[in-house]
Amino acid sequence: SSLQEENVRMYFTTSFPILFEYIKNEIEQWVNHSLLIINRYLDDYGKIQQKFFNGTNPGKLNSIVFGLGDKHNQGESVTLLHFEKAGKLIYVPRKRNLHIHFPKICDWLDGTLNIGFKHPECLISENHTWVEFIENTTCINSDQIHRYYERTGVYLTLLYAMDATDFHYENIIASGEFPVLIDLESFFHPFMPFEFNENHIGLSNSVLKSGLLPA
């Protein structure tokens, strides 16, 4: 509220011009990003209702949590929407085709492995994606723990084969006995020898590159 006062704004612009410009840009980006999300939600509401909420009304939008990932394209970021009745929904400001193709690869493998995988439901539009929010839940017995790590081993193989990186704890949801990968943009990062010194070459050509294993 103080920034609404003319003398305060003048003090900021003259004493801290770079800081003032930074704050101004942050506010403008936040407003633009908020309006974009709301407008896209309204445009996609019918599809969202059918895809994620079984055709029911999720209730009013209680809150929006910004900044769940890095900012891109003038402040856009992954965002969490909280609804009055139906829980939560993730907004991704990009088209994520990998969320369609990766489950197909897992289903193909599961035809032989028969262990089952879990993936978030997605509604993909031309320039953004709505993603099911999956809660962290614990395993209830040792059999579930065993199956969790069995599935994790399959994912480790796939991540290695697809040159994936950055699959640390923030990009994996433990949903009971199912590890769920949530940031598939980390796929396809081929090894670039000119980017690393000799100490990094071994790491970059191993399963440790994925970040899935503790090291």
Residue ranges and their predicted role:
Residues 1-164, 178-180:
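Conserved ATP-binding subdomain of kinase catalytic cores across diverse folds
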Residues 133, 137-215:
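Conserved kinase catalytic-core segment
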